[in-house]
């Protein structure tokens, strides 16, 4: 994107250029030479070139095709930040398949649901992931980066395939990525994104990173590549622009290790979720000079922003979006001064409004944040869920379709948008958007639980923390031991980032006359 003197001019002169035929793999891996990925191996900094990444991806693409995986099939990827993860994505895109990223810390229940709901034909994982498949219906093809029983060895298998592959001729609107996002009702929904998503993300990546790319830029985020923040906001746009991306796996985020990593790997541009920033501030890390820092997921607050400017030497640019239409609003302090307390303004190419109950745009009033369709960053649809798609993509009285975020905001007279809260039950914790239904379903499977409701409670570090209100089964004694057992059960069955950090026992839950739990009443009493 070209920089002009003002935000208004930059926005006015911007125009989308989306070709009819477009493939992510060709765009991010076939156009560049030099360093694509950087990993830290002990005390060594290792670089993977675009040529090496392309060869690995082509070998994997040919392997997938040889095993009957083809266009439109889902390829699940259950791996941490590593070279093989990027190659797996590129291979899926190359053959016209749909990449299905999954969080490496997912437990068997979460993995089983996503594999079954998507109908995945292949799974690329590691020994940790293979171990979680016991008792589950496996995809026909399982490749493991490292030896694991019942799985083909990733490197040994693809070594027998050709490093040459002709990329599929896909349309920009052909499906490419299936990411599951939390919702308030039912199981997580699969968000189906097209190949054009990479182009749609560029304005929201370039502005917060002060018009990336610039000479010497190098990107990193602790956000896993299974999430929109890691995959869509860092890995894919970084590779698209030829900017090296640092890959590193944290078993558990460590602020001192993160600061040391950024210095050792020469990071110049970082996406740091709010929780990571808060932990770094609490740890009192030494200064880490960066060219740009972006953050999103929850409000940062003046104290954290002031600290960040002092430690990183630049203003932190906040941004906002959802998996369904990511990076729509944000900041670029070198281009304009955001209104105090706001998330920023609509990025060039995005028409964002705050709508009242009649879906009419309002200014200086609270309403629902919405993004005008069509837009290249907008999802195609929810996977096999037309009813949810219809609720998300709704026409106003004039027939104009909007992507309804479910978030309440307020727009100022100059276009700055402030976030005021959510109008649903989504829990925003440490940068994750967590829906209560999946957690409640997991807890209800515990034999000691009769009823459960999950809500978010305020948390100084995470923004919100998962809180479970439980009615024990008859004859079960509530207490600390039961609470700990339920917490461990969710950690191992679902995911460590979704377990209830606090558990409360009650004799009954507040209910509506139609038998629904009144979560709002529970939140008000926290």
Spans of model-derived segments:
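Structural core segment of the AMP-binding/adenylate-forming
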Residues: 66, 90-156, 266, 474
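AMP-binding/adenylate-forming catalytic core of the ANL superfamily
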Residues: 106-109, 123-126, 270, 375, ...
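Conserved AMP-binding A3 loop
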Residues: 46-50, 176-203
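Gly/Ser/Thr-rich phosphate-binding loop
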Residues: 240, 267-272, 280-338, 351, ...
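Conserved pre-ATP/AMP-binding loop-to-beta segment of ANL
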Residues: 35, 149, 161-182, 187, ...
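Conserved AMP-binding/adenylation subdomain of ANL enzymes
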Residues: 199-221, 226-268
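Conserved AMP-binding/adenylate-forming core of the ANL superfamily
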Residues: 36-90, 107-112, 155-156
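Conserved ATP/PPi-binding loop(s) of AMP-dependent carboxylate-activating enzymes
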Residues: 346-349, 360-393, 434
């Amino acid at each position: 994107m070209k920089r002009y003197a003002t935000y208004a001019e930059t926005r006015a002169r911007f125009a989308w250029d989306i070709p009819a035929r477009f493939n992510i793999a060709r765009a991010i891996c076939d156009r560049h030479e030099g360093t694509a990925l950087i990993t830290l191996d002990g005390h060594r900094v290792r670089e993977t070139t675009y040529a090496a990444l392309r060869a690995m991806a082509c070998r994997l693409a040919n392997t997938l095709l040889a095993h009957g995986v083809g266009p439109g099939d889902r390829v699940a990827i259950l791996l941490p930040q590593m070279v093989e993860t990027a190659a797996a994505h590129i291979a899926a895109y190359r053959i016209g398949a749909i990449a299905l990223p999954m969080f490496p810390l997912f437990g068997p229940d979460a993995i089983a649901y996503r594999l079954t709901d998507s109908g995945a034909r292949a799974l690329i994982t590691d020994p940790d992931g293979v171990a979680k498949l016991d008792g589950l219906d496996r995809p026909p093809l399982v490749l493991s980066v490292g030896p694991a029983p019942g799985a083909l060895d990733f490197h040994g298998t693809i070594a027998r395939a050709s490093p040459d592959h002709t990329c599929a001729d896909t349309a920009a609107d052909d499906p490419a990525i299936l990411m599951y996002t939390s919702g308030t009702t039912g199981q997580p929904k699969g968000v189906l994104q097209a190949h054009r998503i990479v182009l749609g993300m560029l304005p929201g990546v370039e502005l917060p990173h002060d018009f990336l790319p610039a000479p010497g830029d190098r990107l990193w985020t602790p956000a896993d590549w299974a999430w929109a923040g890691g995959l869509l906001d860092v890995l894919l746009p970084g590779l698209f622009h030829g900017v090296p991306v640092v890959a590193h796996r944290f078993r558990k985020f460590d602020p001192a290790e993160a600061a040391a990593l950024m210095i050792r790997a020469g990071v110049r541009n970082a996406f740091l979720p709010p929780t990571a920033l808060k932990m770094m501030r609490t740890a009192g890390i030494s200064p880490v000079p960066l060219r740009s820092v972006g953050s999103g997921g929850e409000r940062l607050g003046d104290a954290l922003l002031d600290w960040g400017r002092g430690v990183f030497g630049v203003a932190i640019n906040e941004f906002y979006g959802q998996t369904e239409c990511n990076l729509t609003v944000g900041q670029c302090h070198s281009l304009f001064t955001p209104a105090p307390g706001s998330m920023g303004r609509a990025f060039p190419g995005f028409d964002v409004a705050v709508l009242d109950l009649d879906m009419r745009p309002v200014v200086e009033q609270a309403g629902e944040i919405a993004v005008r369709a069509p837009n290249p960053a907008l999802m195609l649809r929810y996977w096999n869920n037309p009813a949810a798609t219809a609720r998300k993509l709704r026409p106003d009285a004039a027939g104009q379709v909007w992507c309804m975020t479910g978030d309440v905001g307020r727009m100022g007279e100059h276009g700055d948008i402030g976030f005021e809260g959510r109008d649903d039950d989504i829990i925003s914790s440490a940068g994750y958007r967590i829906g209560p239904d999946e957690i409640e379903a997991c807890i209800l499977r515990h034999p000691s639980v009769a009823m459960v409701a999950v809500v978010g409670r305020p948390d100084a570090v995470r923004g919100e923390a998962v809180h479970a209100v439980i009615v024990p089964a008859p004859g079960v004694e509530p207490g600390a031991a039961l609470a700990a057992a339920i917490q461990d059960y969710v950690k191992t069955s679902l995911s460590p980032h979704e377990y209830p950090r606090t558990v409360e026992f009650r004799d009954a839950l507040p209910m509506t006359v139609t038998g629904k739990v009144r979560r709002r009443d529970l939140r008000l009493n926290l």
